[in-house]
Amino acid sequence: MTTIILSLSTALSYALQDYLMMPVARAASVIAGVLWIRVVAVLAVAAVAAIIGDLPSGGEEWRAAGFAALGGVFEVAAFLAWLTALSRGQLSVVSPLGSISSAFTVVFVLIIGQSVSSAVWVALPLAVVGGALTSFEPADDGSRSRSAAAGTGWAVLAAAVFGVVTILFGEASALAPITVALFAGLATVLATVPLAVALRAWRLPARFRGRVGACGLMDAGALIAFAAATAIGPLPVVGIIVAQTGTMAVLLGMVLLGERPSRTQMLGIVLTLSAVTLLGTVS
């Protein structure tokens, strides 16, 4: 039961972050959103790490810290692409596409020559077909032609980069999850600050500061909850439940934002989320 509660908390936290960040991404700087979410999250993670974390010791652990930091740098690109997707598209459409980062992780694992479960060979085609159906919407003039739905390209790009982040974090497994999060978060902030200063994009409108601060705290909480869930296990249960982030985001978009994807897109959403759930069973 503890694993289920922690995993559900993680999924709900990420879905709520997507919902809360949509108006920020549309009205303010995407870079400022990434910067301040990560600053708040890193401060929260650092506070927890000061109590239960340990600094790396020895060559293997410092090598792992390097991979964690590199993952943090890639996270900057992933978050920028993701917030751009949220600024342009419907939550119920882009969120399932963002969830297919696990499919990209599998592809990268295959590229480097590692073996995968047979279930993956079912999930990957589902993810491709589901992603394609979700990404296109009917033309406004009522004709049979279709065009790419707003934000879907950015969502797929974010998923691909998050897939790389997962691989890099996997290489940092010699460290405790909270330590990985700390080094990744510090690298994210260090990479984002110069970008924000160079583009003069660090200012966040006052009306969004509470929202972004809450998202930063939820981001840290989700990370800690996920780390605890994976430590308790079993991992397939954690993977399946956390994979429902996309499902929760779809429901939030349809219920709270009044979004209405087309029938074809709904079919794509179902296929995509099914693929993500299947991939969760082999996590």
Task: Name these PLM-found stretches.
Residues 1-13, 20-68, 79-89, 138-153, ...:
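Membrane-interface interhelical linkers
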Residues 14-15, 41, 67, 71-79, ...:
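Transmembrane alpha-helical core positions of polytopic small-molecule transporters
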Residues 24, 33, 85, 111-116, ...:
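Hydrophobic/aromatic residues within transmembrane alpha-helices
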Residues 39-45, 97-110, 187-191, 222-226, ...:
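Alpha-helical transmembrane segments of compact multi-pass small-molecule transporters, enriched
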Residues 44-56, 105-120, 160-178, 219-236, ...:
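Hydrophobic alpha-helical transmembrane segments in multi-pass integral membrane proteins
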Residues 82-84, 103-122, 195-200, 247-266:
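C-terminal transmembrane-helix exit sites in multi-pass transporters
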